[in-house]
Amino acid sequence: MKIIEGNLALKGNEKIAIINARFNHIITDRLVEGAKDAFLRHGGDEKNLTLVLVPGAFEIPMALEKVLASGKFDAVCCVGAVIRGATPHFDYVSAETTKGIANVTLKYAKPVTFGVLTVDSIEQAIERAGSKAGNKGFEAMTGVIEMLNLYKKLGE
């Protein structure tokens, strides 16, 4: 059986955007740090990494649409943090952000990863932003690098 998979090696000329939701910035700043670390560790050139800041997770799909429509980027890593509160707001924001990112990704057929935390507590968010559960920003960036290389092997 033939296996086709991406790898984690960047050549240094890949242009990747990170879209970061500033809301809950104490968490999301750490996710960005993790994503940047992964990009650099795997051979990325910092001049080819762009950070796009949006107010909150709900705005990520709109920014993603503009970023991909520009044609300037090979892949996008989306990060944010939606933390459950006492109202149903969490459910609406989480669902629409997820659907929006998925829809834009399918429209442009470019590698995009979902590094948006959807958690029940600030403690869970901290654990996923560099504590007990690793850094999900780092993981999202490695995922987008792997998918970028897979797309190349599949002929985009």
Swiss-Prot record:
Gene Ontology cellular component annotations, sorted alphabetically: cytosol; riboflavin synthase complex
InterPro entries named among the record's database cross-references: LS, LS/RS, LS/RS_sf
Spans traversing the lipid bilayer: none
SUPFAM superfamilies (UniProt xref): Lumazine synthase
Active-site residues, as the UniProt record annotates them: H89
One term of GO molecular function: 6,7-dimethyl-8-ribityllumazine synthase activity
Family according to the record: Belongs to the DMRL synthase family.
Protein name (database record): 6,7-dimethyl-8-ribityllumazine synthase
Organism listed in the record: Campylobacter concisus (strain 13826)
Gene from which the chain derives: ribH
